[in-house]
Amino acid sequence: MTVLIHVLGSDIPHHNRTVLRFFNDALAATSEHAREFMVVGKDDGLSDSCPALSVQFFPGKKSLAEAVIAKAKANRQQRFFFHGQFNPKLWLALLSGGIKPSQFFWHIWGADLYELSSGLRYKLFYPLRRLAQKRVGCVFATRGDLSFFAKTHPKVRGELLYFPTRMDPSLNTMANDRQREGKMTILVGNSGDRSNEHIAALRAVHQQFGDTVKVVVPMGYPPNNEAYIEEVRQAGLELFSEENLQVLSEKLEFDAYLTLLRQCDLGYFIFARQQGIGTLCLLIQAGIPCVLNRENPFWQDMTEQHLPVLFTTDDLNEDIVREAQRQLASVDKNTIAFFSPNYLQGWQRALAIAAGEVA
């Protein structure tokens, strides 16, 4: 049997590193279909830190896509597992027959499913991408994204799968002992990416709570984002006093980020699509409820796991937030499907499906 090849077709260092380390640590030892990778980006020590994997790095999307297409044409039994995707040339190859549906398995990360960009280039490309997505052999996604995808592609097979968020299961009960009182701290967004709509989110928080809460905005990732960070900071200072606004421009190490999250009382995410599952998981683990846009279908996954969900359209106040915290504290977090290690079973099944080992 031909070994499955995993493709990280866009240079997203943080996510790519998370996926590679997860496969190295949790999957490679038990499955030959969890070891071969083609990745856009620099090695930066990844090969050394992931010795169980065979990783081929490419300088850009175009060179990787050309290599994938060549492999697909040379051996029609070769199957590929595309993580996130984000590579237009690969969608076009699937649409034109360069890659066959039986070779193309896609784990949806959110962005490459939704059509939120207003630029002309995107508007011209979206219909082609939509046609290509009808030809995917199988999609793997959250419950909400599967539901969203099925509305336009009902004939494509869909399987539940969660991004392998880095989590320590021993922390699942840690937050239950914490007493929450006094001025609330609200986390706005999960990164410095513009898709977080930080300024709109800050205005929404201010409309709900005024200048009575402390707002923390983590913007240390992606790099080279100084102009936008300053734009967000200035917009925030028009709404909140300096002592109530903390815009973080430096990238935080994982433990420091965990510490930051555990100082918060609420997470506020205004974006109208599924994203930021890693931050949501870590907040929920810490007993911190989240406010979602009702258009973000991840609320379906949360309610399926009996987790409280607040929406940006709700009338929010401290009493409502404290009640959501109380409800969250009563949930057995060891049973949540999208927490580690529970998502591991879904990954083992996904590998077997993509490799053709199970129907």
From Swiss-Prot:
GO terms for MF: 4-acetamido-4,6-dideoxy-D-galactose transferase activity; fucosyltransferase activity
Membrane topology field: Peripheral membrane protein
GO cellular component, one term: plasma membrane
Top-level taxon of the source organism: Bacteria
Catalytic activity, reaction form: beta-D-ManNAcA-(1->4)-alpha-D-GlcNAc-di-trans,octa-cis-undecaprenyl diphosphate + dTDP-4-acetamido-4,6-dideoxy-alpha-D-galactose = alpha-D-FucNAc4-(1->4)-beta-D-ManNAcA-(1->4)-D-GlcNAc-undecaprenyl diphosphate + dTDP + H(+)
GO annotation, biological process: enterobacterial common antigen biosynthetic process; fucosylation
Compartment(s): Cell inner membrane
Main location: membrane
Coiled-coil ranges from the UniProt annotation: none
Biological or metabolic pathway of the protein: Bacterial outer membrane biogenesis; enterobacterial common antigen biosynthesis
Pfam families, A to Z: Glyco_transf_56
InterPro entries membership: WecF
EC number annotated for this UniProt entry: 2.4.1.325
EC primary class: transferase
Described function: Catalyzes the synthesis of Und-PP-GlcNAc-ManNAcA-Fuc4NAc (Lipid III), the third lipid-linked intermediate involved in ECA synthesis.
Family: Belongs to the glycosyltransferase 56 family.
Protein name: TDP-N-acetylfucosamine:lipid II N-acetylfucosaminyltransferase
Organism of origin: Escherichia coli O6:K15:H31 (strain 536 / UPEC)
Upper lineage: Bacteria, Pseudomonadati, Pseudomonadota, Gammaproteobacteria, Enterobacterales
Gene behind this protein: wecF
